[in-house]
């Protein structure tokens, strides 16, 4: 990691000493600023007077054999535009990331050996590790390769969600010179400066930002941000090149993906098989019970008792920021009025939906997509269910007799459909009549960001502002609601460059309030997994 201590580390030490932040957040931010993880753990223990080291891993791990995992097997041909985590689970066995955020939420080097941030957090120097490609005679992975991948992800023609993370500090909006149907200028993005992504030498890449950003190393582990062989032009498939230990040898979408470890490459297993068992959660549980598979990507909450009864299965519970939101597209007339959107939130009983959909395994959400597990979460007034107020808002918006809508969802995992059914029943009391359209998962993936009203799952991110940037920043690829709020964008950019926990928490509180009053979602719950 960095050879010198960043100026802001002193502030982190003081915040830890003053108990403004806890030890885990100290380690997280210290490592983001370039401190090696062991050093950060040492300082956390020294300042608090308590031992604080990550749990040791077992040293004796058997080698060889085949591991089979039950998981959906989708198309994986365009890694930089992946929409779901399990897409990347196949590709990441072949291709690496520049960094890696572990289960402890600490980000460490992977294809970089270290990074250094300037005092103002606007210049990030990345030093490449000694990694090699599997093919092309085993040539070195270089700064030029990293730069190509970053530029490819930021190309608006590609449509990568990386744009949502980096738009605030590496991109600028430009006028395309064309108008939309309403006569407004059609905008696009481009890299903000010719030297924004600067190759110093084969080992050194410098990111020159237009705004300060503390989470650059975490952004580099966004799951579509895989480092692909530039010679393959962003396309991935059977036999593709990578820097990892495995090669994809077979792929049948909807059935299986088989990866084999390359001779002399590091690793413990010889082969890794992903087996697609479809939308039926019972089939997944049966496969695990009969030991046809060794593990599963995700199990349905309805089968929790079945899993608990399997002697050969260990179950661990973790509180997360995993969720799903009922999101409305603002470019559809039904949802343009913020009073209508707020009425959906006021008509939702989050606690009841939590109990029905996931048996209470999680916590009720507050309709702003920032979780209590995030270090920058701000506790604001709860938006309690209020049917009379919801009816009033609908009437003010021109719907005195209620409103008819259609909401799309998928059947797998089953809790998502159950959550939608629960909310739809609740909305009836406010005069919201919702038709539920359940699409097969593979069809839902094709339209998840296009349907006027849909229930979309969002995975955990370590910081509160990260999913806000991905999902609600104006004009970014994963802004499935077409939400646009200038004040929201301004506060979001401010939060991204603020390292002081207390100060950033206050900014997040303002963002949370905007989401509750003006936002495009009704969010019932957070999942524990």
Task: List the predicted regions and their residue ranges.
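Structural transition elements
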Residues: 363-396, 411-418
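Extracellular/periplasmic solute-recognition and catalytic clefts
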Residues: 72, 249-260, 273-332, 355, ...
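N-terminal secretory signal peptides
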Residues: 1-25, 34, 47-51
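Periplasmic-binding protein-like
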Residues: 154-156, 306-307, 331, 335-373, ...
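Extracytoplasmic/peripheral linker and loop segments enriched in polar/acidic and small residues
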Residues: 127, 339-342, 433-444, 467-529
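Gly/Pro-rich hinge or "lid" segments in bacterial periplasmic/extracellular proteins
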Residues: 102-106, 178-204, 208-273, 282, ...
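N-terminal lobe/hinge region of extracytoplasmic solute-binding protein
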Residues: 70-119, 148, 241-242
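Aromatic- and charge-enriched surface segment that lines or borders ligand/interaction sites
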Residues: 114-165, 286-287, 334
